[in-house]
Amino acid sequence: MAIYLTELDSKSLDFPPAENALADPNGLLAFGGDLTPERLIAAYHHGIFPWYGPGEPILWWSPSTRAVFDPNTFLPAKSLKKFQRKAQYQVSINHATPEVIKLCGNTRPAEETWLNEEMQAAYISLALQGVCHSVEVWQDQRLIGGFYGLSIGELFCGESMFSLETNASKIALWYFCRHFSEHGGKLIDCQVMNSHLHSLGAFTLPREEFLQRLLCLKQQRVTSGCFSPQWLKRHNA
């Protein structure tokens, strides 16, 4: 049976409705276009994100269920609290965004390198526009973990994370959830559920509910200073 898939017009930033995404493969909505900052921003504002492998065209997705965190109710595991009390990790925001993006792509096994140089350059461009942000974890002035994503009002769209030392990415998420919540953040989008996200407390929303929440959250703003370059206070767990 033939499958109809929209090819994006290079001269237009319009996307088909996210509800038109295929059931198999789950969430595939369109192909083509480019990774300009304008198109990426338009995509995320409609609950759509790019993901494609080597040799494939740019593919755009909006899966039927969305993995998310509620930063206001995020609870770290007791073992993570215990680890944090002993670890000499420091956490920052927007101190090394290009480096975080590159490490998210370069520290993955070869078969998982969807975050290619083209994608990395696209998100670095968004960082220069103040749309893409990073959370960094440091040990003895060495960058050992973190993640990056896009801010859309009271929603943060997490893209990718990396960890070079034990629990580094978990510490990054924990600290960011508290910081984001304190500045009025309401939801963190993780796109597709996996065992690691589930173990950290992520849950899923049906696409329709996620899009409804996105519509409301993108019209709001977190409080001033949320994404200013800064060091986050150490938690007294």
From Swiss-Prot:
It comes from the Bacteria. One of its GO terms (cellular component) is cytoplasm. GO terms for molecular function: leucyl-tRNA--protein transferase activity. It holds the Pfam family Leu_Phe_trans. Its EC number is 2.3.2.6. GO terms for biological process: protein catabolic process. Keywords: Acyltransferase, Cytoplasm, Transferase. It catalyses: N-terminal L-lysyl-[protein] + L-leucyl-tRNA(Leu) = N-terminal L-leucyl-L-lysyl-[protein] + tRNA(Leu) + H(+); N-terminal L-arginyl-[protein] + L-leucyl-tRNA(Leu) = N-terminal L-leucyl-L-arginyl-[protein] + tRNA(Leu) + H(+); L-phenylalanyl-tRNA(Phe) + an N-terminal L-alpha-aminoacyl-[protein] = an N-terminal L-phenylalanyl-L-alpha-aminoacyl-[protein] + tRNA(Phe). Gene3D superfamilies: Leucyl/phenylalanyl-tRNA-protein transferase, C-terminal domain, Leucyl/phenylalanyl-tRNA-protein transferase, N-terminal domain. It is found in: Cytoplasm. The keyword Transferase applies. Its main location: cytoplasm. Functions in the N-end rule pathway of protein degradation where it conjugates Leu, Phe and, less efficiently, Met from aminoacyl-tRNAs to the N-termini of proteins containing an N-terminal arginine or lysine. Belongs to the L/F-transferase family. PANTHER family: LEUCYL/PHENYLALANYL-TRNA--PROTEIN TRANSFERASE, LEUCYL_PHENYLALANYL-TRNA--PROTEIN TRANSFERASE. NCBIfam families: aat. This is Leucyl/phenylalanyl-tRNA--protein transferase. The gene is aat.
